[in-house]
Amino acid sequence: MPAVGFCGEWFIFTCDKKLVAIHTKQARESFVFDCSTAEKKPNNTKDVSNGDGGASEETGSDKVLAFAVSPSGNLVALTDDSKRLVLFHCEPSWQCISIRWVVRRCTSLMFNQAEDQLLATDKSGDVYSFSVGEPQREGELKMGHLSMLLAMSMSPDDKFIITADRDEKIRVSHLRSPYNIQSFCLGHQQFVSALLVPPGHPHWLLSGSGDGTMKLWDYESGRKLQSWDLKEHEETSSSEADKQKKPTVCRISCSPDARHVAVQCERASTVHFFTVDQDGEEKLVPHRRLSLPHCPLDMTFDPEGQLWVLMDSGDAPLQIYTHRRDSWESDAESPELIRVTEAFKPHWETLEASLRTDSRFEHLYKVNFDNVAAYLQKKQQRLEEQLKRGGGHRRPTATRRPEHNGCNKVILLNGHRDISC
């Protein structure tokens, strides 16, 4: 799935095997990193076998899985399905600092606030820490989980690391001693797919899930503050199948001034906006729902607070929305948008349409099997057959007789002997 972000004034997007960076303010040369032409994995690098003791994971296709930007905007990291972990710095010019190798394919990346660690979560539930100051040093295992990790965040003071997994759990752990768990944030009914500690609110945590809800937490205590069912904010659907479908929250983004929160759901042509209400107790309130001409694939705020949306469209894949007069308006004539689109389109047009909309979440939903009804039906048939064989008289299920060992009775229940004293 394509993704977008900002590194200072550089607009970044990943597209299949490439990471492309385009400067939004100046006519500087774009930076392109193609994973398919990057350094290959050395033969002496250890591979991890699967749980059955079989062969290692299949050979990757060099597709970019995730990228992260450091808080200062000076560093960028990416990981691909060939298990590369690539570190760049972007100022004064783009340069690849190192290529390292992860144990298993990663699901998310994040720099800490001090920018001396790059944290990576993988599909087996492990979190590894990679040194930024020693770019050739191997990763250190920080913590493990029993389920696949899907999202990660950190407190602004680097005290806590927050991880979300496929089994609906959000865990808050101490970064320096991850075995020390501060709290759990429990309440989602499906996998947790997005996390965000919004700027300006260091004790808040926003989480999105496959159950179609977004929740606000005080993450240090694990207390839920607010919850919204995003399906209730959607327009009425004409399809009965769509009515039963829960929107999967795939991105939660906050404007730099911390006033606006944008929420994107997978395969829904809308963006939900929330604002911070500071009258009395601070809380989030639903503000607007922005209808888009196409389904969004990803979105991000730029440093000026404009929302950039990447859409599933061949003609106009990028749009900018600016907050004016209490609403979000498209800014199609923006010089930044024109400059970026001109450099962006050649890479976008080479990407197959089917690869643009690959779902990351379809296989994560829990499948429910109703075997109780079948069990009860078979049990009823068995009882009826027993009644027929017994001439219509059912044996008593309990008998009572005295015992000589001081016990009062022996009860025979369903063939099991139970002695009550």
What is each PLM-predicted segment?
Residues 8-9, 72-74, 114-116, 157-159, ...:
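Short coil/turn segments that connect the beta-strands within blades of beta-propeller domains
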